[in-house]
């Protein structure tokens, strides 16, 4: 997910995306801890996507 794509979305869409990513992160962590996750790099990728969404939300709140 690119930051430019996120900047075009509304605050409501960003909040929905953040909620979806947090749920996905939870699911990935559960699978990782129970040795059901073969693609461990997805945890890092989702964590960074969450950071991108939060950054754009903070930028929109300040503007």
From Swiss-Prot:
One protein family per Pfam: Ribosomal_L29
Cross-referenced InterPro entries: Ribosomal_protein_uL29, Ribosomal_uL29, Ribosomal_uL29_sf
GO CC term, one of those recorded: cytosolic large ribosomal subunit
Residues of the signal peptide: none
Biological process according to GO: translation
GO MF annotation list: structural constituent of ribosome
Keyword Endoplasmic reticulum: no
SUPFAM superfamilies to which the protein is assigned, alphabetical: Ribosomal protein L29 (L29p)
UniProt keyword annotations, A-Z: Ribonucleoprotein, Ribosomal protein
Highest taxon in the source lineage: Bacteria
Coiled coil: none
Similarity comment text for this entry: Belongs to the universal ribosomal protein uL29 family.
Name of this chain's protein: Large ribosomal subunit protein uL29
Organism whose genome encodes this protein: Psychromonas ingrahamii (strain DSM 17664 / CCUG 51855 / 37)
